[in-house]
């Protein structure tokens, strides 16, 4: 049986934020938790399904993989959520809803936030790949206070509310729930004399330069993950990740559709009529394109393997050239006379032979009006 869409399971939209995801999961967890539905297999299944969906969507990197590749992108990464459905209410409230007082649930450390950066590339760069340097805003440990957040000569003090534990217990009905301390916001410490350089944060802003290796074949919407290059963690927590989102600029000649490239090639009325040969551009250089006689405007010519090689491997696409027969402009009097003479040679008994589409079109129009009886 195919898995349901995780967003559908939680009943949220695909652009839901972290709070909406938590709120939706809390509602389902309270409704279907095994502690409240003993011996109810259907409720247990729904609880596990909701827990699995929450585990993926609450993790930014797993969510990004799921958004791009669906269930195939996260197979094996979902553990069923909170130990496969065996977690207690206290675990759920501590892990998911511990921010009621503005802090984390059980951990004293906080993972750094993920960052996103839009990288604009030319089509040639996206197709061939390259290494680019980007500058992103970030943080580093404050040197003035060595990351403590306290002014030199002072230090953080143990929080009197939680006695340095960073957590307090509160009663909710029949359950005792462990929450982040509202006084110290889960840190276990109080800074009475904050550092003037970092305002008690223990870190200051610093721009950093990173090298991003862009693989060949990327397209608009593709994302490159740089693990550990996001915001620094709080209180020794791990850093977040940086997601580089690719945006390919419009090209003056080519348009892209997956692996294939398209371009328009103008040809003269003479080349279209008599045939000829011309050079067309590709991303690998110029190639010869043979135009057969009696070519009509809009005809597509396919150049095999002159498109884009997929970023995840596989054969290259094709380049499709659509010819546009140009009508001559700015003609001299003599040129117009020659065209009129040429037109006279096409008229007469053999006129339909030289313009079959035109003849069939006029016949179709005539039949249309005859049927409508105008």
Swiss-Prot record:
Cofactors required: Zn(2+)
Read off the Gene3D superfamilies from this record.
Answer: DnaJ domain (1.10.287.110), Heat shock protein DnaJ, cysteine-rich domain (2.10.230.10), Urease metallochaperone UreE, N-terminal domain (2.60.260.20)
Q: Describe the family membership recorded for this protein in Swiss-Prot or TrEMBL.
A: Belongs to the DnaJ family.
Domain remark in the UniProt entry: The J domain is necessary and sufficient to stimulate DnaK ATPase activity. Zinc center 1 plays an important role in the autonomous, DnaK-independent chaperone activity of DnaJ. Zinc center 2 is essential for interaction with DnaK and for DnaJ activity.
Record the organism: Marinobacter nauticus (strain ATCC 700491 / DSM 11845 / VT8)
Stated role: Participates actively in the response to hyperosmotic and heat shock by preventing the aggregation of stress-denatured proteins and by disaggregating proteins, also in an autonomous, DnaK-independent fashion. Unfolded proteins bind initially to DnaJ; upon interaction with the DnaJ-bound protein, DnaK hydrolyzes its bound ATP, resulting in the formation of a stable complex. GrpE releases ADP from DnaK; ATP binding to DnaK triggers the release of the substrate protein, thus completing the reaction cycle.
Q: Which GO terms describe its biological process?
A: chaperone cofactor-dependent protein refolding; DNA replication; protein refolding; response to heat
Q: Cite the InterPro entries for this sequence.
A: DnaJ, DnaJ_C, DnaJ_domain, DnaJ_domain_CS, HSP40/DnaJ_pept-bd, HSP_DnaJ_Cys-rich_dom, HSP_DnaJ_Cys-rich_dom_sf, J_dom_sf
Q: How does it assemble?
A: Homodimer.
Q: What lineage is on file?
A: Bacteria, Pseudomonadati, Pseudomonadota, Gammaproteobacteria, Pseudomonadales
**The protein, known as:** Chaperone protein DnaJ
Spans of repeat CXXCXGXG motif: 142-149, 159-166, 181-188, 195-202
Which residues are listed for Zn(2+) 1 binding in this entry? 142, 145, 195, 198
Annotated Zn(2+) 2 binding sites? 159, 162, 181, 184
Recorded superkingdom: Bacteria
The cofactor note from the UniProt entry for this protein is: Binds 2 Zn(2+) ions per monomer.
SMART domains, from UniProt?
Answer: DnaJ (SM00271)
**Where does the record place the J domain?**
5-70
| Database matches in Pfam families | DnaJ (PF00226), DnaJ_C (PF01556), DnaJ_CXXCXGXG (PF00684)
């Amino acid at each position: 049986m195919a898995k349901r869409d995780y967003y559908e399971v939680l009943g949220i939209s695909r652009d839901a934020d972290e709070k909406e995801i938590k709120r939706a999961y809390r509602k389902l967890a309270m409704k279907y938790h095994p502690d409240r539905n003993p011996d109810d297999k259907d409720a247990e299944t729904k609880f596990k399904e909701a827990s699995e969906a929450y585990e993926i969507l609450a993790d930014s990197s797993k969510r990004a993989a799921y958004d791009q590749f669906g269930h195939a992108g996260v197979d094996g990464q979902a553990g069923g959520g909170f130990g496969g459905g065996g977690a207690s209410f206290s675990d759920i409230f501590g892990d998911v809803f511990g921010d009621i007082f503005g802090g984390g649930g059980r951990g004293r450390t906080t993972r750094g936030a993920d960052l996103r950066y839009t990288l604009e590339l030319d089509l040639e760069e996206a197709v061939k790949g390259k290494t680019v340097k980007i500058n992103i805003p970030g943080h580093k440990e404050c040197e003035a206070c060595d990351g403590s957040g306290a002014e030199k000569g002072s230090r953080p003090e143990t929080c009197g509310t939680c006695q340095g534990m960073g957590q307090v217990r509160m009663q909710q009905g029949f359950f005792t729930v462990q929450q982040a301390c509202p006084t110290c916001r889960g840190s276990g410490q109080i800074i009475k004399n904050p550092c003037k350089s970092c305002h008690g944060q223990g870190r200051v802003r610093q721009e950093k330069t990173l090298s991003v290796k862009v693989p060949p074949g990327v397209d608009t919407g593709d994302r490159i993950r740089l693990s550990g290059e996001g915001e620094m963690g709080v209180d020794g927590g791990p850093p977040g990740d940086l997601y580089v989102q690719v945006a390919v600029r419009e090209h003056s000649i080519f348009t892209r559709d997956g692996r294939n490239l398209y371009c328009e090639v103008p040809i003269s009325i003479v080349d279209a009529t008599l045939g000829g040969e011309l050079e067309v551009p590709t991303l690998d250089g110029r190639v010869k394109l043979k135009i057969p006689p009696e070519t009509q405007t809009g005809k597509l010519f396919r150049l095999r393997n002159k498109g884009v090689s997929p970023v995840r491997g596989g054969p290259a696409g094709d380049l499709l050239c659509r010819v546009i027969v140009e009508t001559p402009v700015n003609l001299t009097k003599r040129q117009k006379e020659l065209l009129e003479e040429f037109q006279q040679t096409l008229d007469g008994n053999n006129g339909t032979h030289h313009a079959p589409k035109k003849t069939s079109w006029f016949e179709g129009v005539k039949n249309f009006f005859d049927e409508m009886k105008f």
